[in-house]
């Protein structure tokens, strides 16, 4: 009984200290807890006032500065990107890029007046969107146009090569690595010097394609942001060629990207099998065959007359039978090469041999046959 009285007294005292209208502190605490919970989960009204950090800004814009690509290998994205970009092999394209490496080695040596070695790292297929996300920044991206193919390509020069080229062209000492200055845009001098190098590479690329199909490559613009160098849809496939350029202790990489849509007009030519060092028209063999053709021995027949006789008469011919010809001593004979009539001539004698003197130029049929051989 005493315990019940004590409990009632305690409840009355608590009620007097906390009137029904005084529960705002509890509600405020509840609201505060809800606000904290919403802040922890990224929701609620407080989330709209929060300032994003740099990682969240890069993720929102689609940049991946970490370079590990771990996000692409987890979850649903890993399932979506699990299918490898596999397209038909283009044998002649490998020969074109091999020729490009040899041409660039000579051209860049003349361009830099230095010992330059160009090597082909690999040729692969990649989605255009994946390539844009994988470009290491800072870099200079050159958008060029393939005139005859009516499409575009992309050439990427990394930061190491940019500073190396600038250092070499401006008289940097050999044996010292080029100094990199991060955190600033490329200067006008750097862009102009790199543009000259890109024009040399595009000229070599034109020469590499010329034996297969004449293509002119012209520089369209230079970009430093991959988002402004979009020449195809993100899901479109492209050929990626990685080239390594070494200049003693300096150097860098050039990446050449050609969408499959750009190569589509000459796809049949690129599918051909490589049959030798030269492909297409070979001037050496053409001249050799022309020389040998003029010295070829051919059989020429002089036909005096032709007759049609019954088969029975031919089968019954005996020694001593006479066959009368519809020709006189003054009749012209026809000169033939196989079944092709060449010209007509008159028979005679020269020294101790019977000869034929041509009395007319080559017939139209003979000229047409010679043109077919050409």
UniProtKB/Swiss-Prot annotation:
Keywords: Bacterial flagellum, Cell inner membrane, Cell membrane, Chemotaxis, Flagellar rotation, Membrane. Coiled coil: none annotated. GO terms for molecular function: cytoskeletal motor activity. GO terms for cellular component: bacterial-type flagellum basal body; plasma membrane. Its main location: membrane. Residues 32-46 have a biased composition (Gly residues). It is a peripheral membrane protein. CDD domains: FliM. Residues 1-48 are annotated as: Disordered. InterPro entries: CheC-like_sf, Flag_FliM, FliN-like_C, SpoA-like_sf. It is found in: Cell inner membrane; Bacterial flagellum basal body. The keyword Membrane applies. GO terms for biological process: bacterial-type flagellum-dependent swarming motility; positive chemotaxis. Belongs to the FliM family. FliM is one of three proteins (FliG, FliN, FliM) that forms the rotor-mounted switch complex (C ring), located at the base of the basal body. This complex interacts with the CheY and CheZ chemotaxis proteins, in addition to contacting components of the motor that determine the direction of flagellar rotation. This is Flagellar motor switch protein FliM. It comes from Caulobacter vibrioides (strain NA1000 / CB15N) (Caulobacter crescentus). The gene is fliM.
């Amino acid at each position: 009984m005493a315990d019940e009285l004590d409990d009632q007294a305690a409840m009355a005292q608590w009620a007097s200290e906390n009137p029904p209208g005084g529960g705002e502190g509890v509600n405020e605490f509840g609201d505060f807890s809800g606000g904290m919970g919403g802040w922890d989960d990224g929701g609620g009204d407080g989330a709209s006032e929060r300032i994003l950090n740099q990682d969240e800004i890069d993720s929102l814009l689609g940049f991946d500065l970490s370079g590990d690509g771990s996000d692409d290998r987890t979850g649903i994205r890993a399932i979506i990107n699990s299918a490898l970009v596999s397209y038909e092999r283009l044998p002649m394209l490998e020969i074109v890029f091999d020729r490009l490496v040899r041409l660039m080695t000579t051209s860049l040596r003349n361009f830099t007046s230095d010992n330059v070695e160009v090597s082909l790292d690999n040729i692969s297929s990649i989605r255009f969107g994946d390539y844009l996300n994988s470009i290491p920044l800072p870099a200079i991206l050159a958008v060029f146009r393939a005139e005859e193919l009516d499409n575009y390509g992309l050439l990427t020069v990394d930061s190491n090569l940019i500073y190396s080229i600038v250092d070499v062209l401006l008289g940097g000492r050999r044996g010292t690595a080029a100094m990199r200055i991060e955190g600033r845009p490329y200067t006008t001098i750097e862009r102009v010097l790199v543009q000259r190098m890109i024009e040399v590479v595009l000229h070599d690329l034109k020469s590499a394609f010329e034996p297969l199909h004449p293509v002119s490559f012209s520089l369209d613009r230079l970009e430093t942001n991959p988002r402004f160098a979009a020449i195809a849809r993100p899901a479109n496939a492209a050929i990626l060629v990685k080239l390594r350029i070494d200049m003693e202790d300096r150097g860098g990489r050039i990446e050449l990207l050609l969408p499959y849509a750009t190569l589509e007009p000459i796809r049949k030519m690129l599918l051909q099998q490589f049959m030798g060092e030269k492909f297409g028209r070979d001037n050496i063999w053409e001249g050799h065959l022309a020389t040998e053709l003029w010295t070829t021995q051919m059989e020429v027949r002089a036909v005096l007359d032709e007759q049609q006789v019954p088969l029975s008469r031919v089968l019954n011919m005996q020694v001593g039978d006479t066959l009368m010809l519809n020709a006189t001593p003054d009749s012209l004979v026809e000169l033939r090469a196989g079944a092709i009539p060449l010209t007509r001539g008159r028979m005679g004698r020269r020294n101790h041999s019977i000869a034929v003197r041509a009395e007319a130029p080559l017939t139209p049929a003979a000229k047409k046959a010679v043109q077919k051989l050409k």
